[in-house]
């Protein structure tokens, strides 16, 4: 959420930012509502002060006629103040609703574009493998190896759910432990978060928990929703807190299941594990001072790249354009892995610097030594999204006999060098 004073003082820049992002937000209405709220607050302060003056004056006044006039004025105020308070509540609710529609400002070097087709490639690592045979995609590999069962998932739960079986279970656990070990070695605090969060935490991090546009599963008759990412719970753990500056930056590696409705997702690009309703993810999250956040963003990106280099998976890094940033991100990078099954790159990680956008919504501040509390910055980044990483790993490391050779770094975590054909 942007600061109201900033919106007032930079209304034209905020409007341009909304246009660049393709976001419909009424900046003028927000300014108008903010001004009306300020006017109502001042009016109420004056009315309450006058009410207190009248109470004292009535107690002192001995002239009955004058006393009657004072009592009548006090009675009028007694009716007027609740009406103004009700009006203020309505204005504040509308202001909060409209203010939430305004996205974060954008890094000046982020590319301007309408959608993901205008994201800008920064660099590549690795070469797409050249197979001396007709390669299979991960769905064909998973079924042939007996390790991914989409039919059982559809039967028990619905489409876009799946069972992992046998060596795929070991592979998921190995990927998770590999990522956690790497992050622990870089000073990240390990956390296993709840899979549910209060709606305030979702709204605070920029997600829409309810309504027709939501990608979130919510729990009926509660203020709880299934999380789409541990970013939500990791950010929410410090809601309404003030932390010491010397404790920053704080880095977390959060393990959780993630749940997404993936409404509207279809087509070959969404095949198999690419867009599913539930998956496991290790998420990086950091609280920093404003001065630290740029460097932290680059650190998270470098870790994401290191993970995919270590897994020997070709990838490219893209700078996300304004139309694809989402509400909270000031700047965002994606790592896209080469996926032979689609003959193209597919997103496997994202990392975003959300500056103070989430912190303002969640009331998270830090106190500089000897100073007043200030809003801190928050950042997030995917370490391992298991389902998509599994796609890239199976497809890039497949062999002609239908087996999959695991990269050397994963062997100790999975306990084998090769995932072989299913034994019947």
Curated annotation (Swiss-Prot):
Signal sequence interval, chain numbering: none
Residues binding ATP: 260-262, 276, 347-350
SUPFAM superfamilies in alphabetical order: Class II aaRS and biotin synthetases, tRNA-binding arm
EC number: 6.1.1.11
Primary localization class, coarse: cytoplasm
Compartments where located: Cytoplasm
Keyword Flavoprotein in record: no
Alphabetic keyword roster: Aminoacyl-tRNA synthetase, ATP-binding, Cytoplasm, Ligase, Nucleotide-binding, Protein biosynthesis
Stored NCBIfam families: serS (TIGR00414)
Family as reported in the entry's similarity comment: Belongs to the class-II aminoacyl-tRNA synthetase family. Type-1 seryl-tRNA synthetase subfamily.
Self-association and partners: Homodimer. The tRNA molecule binds across the dimer.
Name the record gives this protein: Serine--tRNA ligase
High-level lineage: Bacteria, Bacillati, Actinomycetota, Rubrobacteria, Rubrobacterales
């Amino acid at each position: 959420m942007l600061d109201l004073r900033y919106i007032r003082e930079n209304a034209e820049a905020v409007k341009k930012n909304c246009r660049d992002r393709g976001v419909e937000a009424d900046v003028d209405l927000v300014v108008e509502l903010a001004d009306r709220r300020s006017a109502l607050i001042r009016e109420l302060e004056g009315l309450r002060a006058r009410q207190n003056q009248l109470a004292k004056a009535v107690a002192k006044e001995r002239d009955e006629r004058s006393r009657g006039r004072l009592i009548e004025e006090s009675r009028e105020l007694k009716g007027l103040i609740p009406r103004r308070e009700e009006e203020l509540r309505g204005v504040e609710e509308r202001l909060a609703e409209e203010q939430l529609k305004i996205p974060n400002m954008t890094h000046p070097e982020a590319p301007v574009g309408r959608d993901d087709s205008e994201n800008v490639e920064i660099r590549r690592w690795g070469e797409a493998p050249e197979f001396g045979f007709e390669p299979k995609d991960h769905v064909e590999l998973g079924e042939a190896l007996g390790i991914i069962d989409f039919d059982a998932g559809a039967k028990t739960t619905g489409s876009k759910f799946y069972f992992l079986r046998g060596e795929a279970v070991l592979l998921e656990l190995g990927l998770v432990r590999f990522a956690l070990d790497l992050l622990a070695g870089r000073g990240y605090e390990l956390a296993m978060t709840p899979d549910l969060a209060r709606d305030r935490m979702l709204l605070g991090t920029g997600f829409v928990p309810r309504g027709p546009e939501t990608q979130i599963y919510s729990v009926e008759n509660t203020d709880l929703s299934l999380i789409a990412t541990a970013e939500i719970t990791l950010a929410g753990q410090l809601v309404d807190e003030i932390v010491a500056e010397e404790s920053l930056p704080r880095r977390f590696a959060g393990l959780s299941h993630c749940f997404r409705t993936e409404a509207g997702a279809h087509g070959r690009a969404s095949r198999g594990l690419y867009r599913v309703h539930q998956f496991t993810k290790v998420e990086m999250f950091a609280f920093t001072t404003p001065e630290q956040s740029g460097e932290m963003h680059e650190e998270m990106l470098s870790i994401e790249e290191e993970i995919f280099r270590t897994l020997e998976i070709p990838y490219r890094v893209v700078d996300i354009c304004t139309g694809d940033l989402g509400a909270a991100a000031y700047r965002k990078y994606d790592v896209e892995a080469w996926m032979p099954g689609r003959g193209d790159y597919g997103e496997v990680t994202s990392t975003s610097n959300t500056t103070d956008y989430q912190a303002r919504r969640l009331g998270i501040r830090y106190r500089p030594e000897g100073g007043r509390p200030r809003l801190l910055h928050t950042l997030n980044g995917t370490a391992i999204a298991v389902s998509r990483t599994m796609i890239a790993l199976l497809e890039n490391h497949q062999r002609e006999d239908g087996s999959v050779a695991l990269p050397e770094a994963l062997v100790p975590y999975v306990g084998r060098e090769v995932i072989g054909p299913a034994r019947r």
